Structure formats: structure tokens, C-alpha cells
């Protein structure tokens, strides 16, 4: 399929740029890579790609179906349609990303990406295999209503994902006026950090103005060096375990809860919530 071919070429590019980053880090005498962590990251990327290529996901409602049933307009694929759709995808991704951080049951879909205590291009490959159900279809209803063709969405979704790779690096510092427009390495370092001032900030994927609009922006501070990872460290390099460790912990905590109400509530409460 076209997606399989795109993934193959993208992975070649990703690996090449990781080597360049490693060489640059040696020249600059900065410790950027840890071998076991890097192997864990690459393994996560490979398993995620296998899941995608084998189509091991359950799509509750497809964009094709929404387009066929909800489209008010019929528009052809032109350059402005691609731009509009890209902004729509980026807006949807802001909210999927934010909700994955904010709710217990959804955090398991994303924890693997934040589990590394390093921050480098390999870290970008840490993608989940535990998000079996595609639940965020409703965020694409506005695009379907406008009549954005499914072909446009199919082309843009992998491009939007691949465009999030480059800013997972410590080697690029401030990018001047671009800091006000797009997500930069500085913005995303903040997002991956567990320092109190940085937690739950900078959810945007491509355009940083979503964080400005919705009150989740935080600038990287020279006085606050980012500390990476998750608040409850994985303490393992095994990507399969990391993918499901939060889900396992929720099951254990739900069993321990004294009230049936709490056994159910724990899944849908904010990340970190536990019964008193």
C-alpha cells in the first residue's frame, strides 16, 4: 500500500537523521543517546509500524463513512483544501494529545512516548501499540461536513505524523520568530519534561498557537533544565511492558478500591487520580 511505502522511506530518513544527531552530539560533547534506551525506542517504532501495516486497529466510524453521510458540500482536491485539512488535522491532534494526557484510561495510549528519560530523535519513534480502538473520529466531523475528500485526509495524516519527528532533539536551541508560529524543539522539550512548571504543557503538534489559544503554553526557561520521563518511571527497557504498564496499574488500583463507584470512576478521572 501507499502507506507501507511511505513508512519504509520515512524510517530510512529517520534512521539517517538519528545517526547525524549522534555524530553531532559527539562533536558538541553532549550526551544525547543511551544504547538500551535507543534500542527500546526503535523497537517501539517497529512494533507500531507493524501494527499499522497489518491494520490491527478497530475503526469505530471511518472518515469515509462520515464524508458519505455528513458532507454538506462537494469540493475537489485543490491546494487550499489541503491547507484547510492540514489545519483541521492539527486542531484535532491538539485535543487527542491533550486528552491522552489528562484522563487515566487514555494515558495508556501515550505513556510509551514519554517513558524515555532521554530526549532525542529516537524518542520520537516511541509510538504506542496499545491504542487498538480509534476513538477520536468525532473530531474529524467538521472536515467531513465541509466535504474534505477522504483522499486528502489519507495523504495528510502520515505527513502530519512524520512532521512531528524533527523537533525531538536537544541540539537545536531557540529558533527566533518561528517560536511564535510552529512547534520547535524548545517547545517540545517542555512538553516531555516532568518538572512541575512544565507538566501538562505544549500539546500542539505543528502550530504552537493552539497552546496560546487554549492556555497550555509554557516557554522553556534557562533556569529550569528539563528532566525527562514519566512521574512513575518504567524501570525497564521492555517496550511491550511499557505500553501496558499504566493499564495494569489501573486494574490493580481498581481492584483495591473499596467502593464500586471508585472502581469505575478511576478509569475516567484525571491522570493520577486515586480514591482516598
What are the residue ranges of the model-derived segments?
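Hydrophobic transmembrane alpha-helical segments in integral membrane proteins
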Residues: 1-14
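Central hydrophobic cores of alpha-helical transmembrane segments in multi-pass inner-membrane proteins
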Residues: 13-25, 60, 86-92
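Membrane-interface helix-loop junction between the first two transmembrane segments
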Residues: 19-39
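Membrane-helix interface/capping segments
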Residues: 29, 59-66, 99-106
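Membrane-embedded catalytic scaffold of the fatty acid hydroxylase/desaturase
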Residues: 45-55, 71, 76-228
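Alpha-helical membrane-anchoring segments
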Residues: 51-62, 258-261, 274
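Cytosolic-facing loops and C-terminal tails of multi-pass membrane proteins
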Residues: 224-276
Amino acid at each position: 500500500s501507499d502507506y507501507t511505502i511511505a513508512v519504509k522511506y520515512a524510517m530510512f530518513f529517520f534512521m539517517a537523521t538519528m545517526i547525524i544527531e549522534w555524530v553531532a552530539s559527539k562533536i558538541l560533547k553532549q550526551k544525547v543517546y543511551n544504547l538500551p534506551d535507543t534500542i527500546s525506542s526503535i523497537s517501539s517504532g517497529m512494533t507500531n509500524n507493524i501494527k499499522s501495516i497489518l491494520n490491527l486497529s478497530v475503526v469505530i466510524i471511518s472518515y469515509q463513512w462520515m464524508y458519505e453521510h455528513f458532507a454538506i458540500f462537494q469540493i475537489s482536491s485543490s491546494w487550499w483544501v489541503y491547507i484547510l485539512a492540514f489545519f483541521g488535522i492539527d486542531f484535532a491532534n491538539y485535543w487527542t494529545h491533550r486528552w491522552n494526557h489528562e484522563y487515566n484510561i487514555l494515558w495508556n495510549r501515550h505513556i510509551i512516548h514519554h517513558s524515555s528519560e532521554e530526549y532525542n530523535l529516537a524518542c520520537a519513534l516511541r509510538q504506542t501499540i496499545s491504542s487498538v480502538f480509534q476513538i477520536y473520529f468525532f473530531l474529524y466531523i467538521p472536515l467531513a461536513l465541509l466535504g474534505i475528500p477522504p483522499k486528502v485526509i489519507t495523504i495528510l495524516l502520515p505527513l502530519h505524523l512524520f512532521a512531528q519527528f524533527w523537533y525531538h532533539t536537544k541540539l537545536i536551541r531557540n529558533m527566533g520568530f518561528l517560536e511564535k508560529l510552529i512547534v520547535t524543539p524548545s517547545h517540545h522539550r517542555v512538553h516531555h519534561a516532568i518538572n512541575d512548571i512544565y507538566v501538562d504543557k505544549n500539546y500542539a503538534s505543528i502550530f504552537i498557537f493552539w497552546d496560546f489559544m487554549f492556555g497550555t503554553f509554557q516557554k522553556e526557561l534557562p533556569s529550569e533544565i528539563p528532566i525527562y520521563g514519566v512521574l512513575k518511571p518504567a524501570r525497564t527497557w521492555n517496550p511491550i511492558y511499557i505500553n501496558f504498564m499504566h493499564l495494569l496499574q489501573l486494574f490493580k488500583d481498581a481492584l483495591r478500591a473499596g467502593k464500586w463507584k471508585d472502581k469505575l470512576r478511576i478509569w475516567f478521572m484525571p491522570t493520577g487520580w486515586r480514591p482516598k
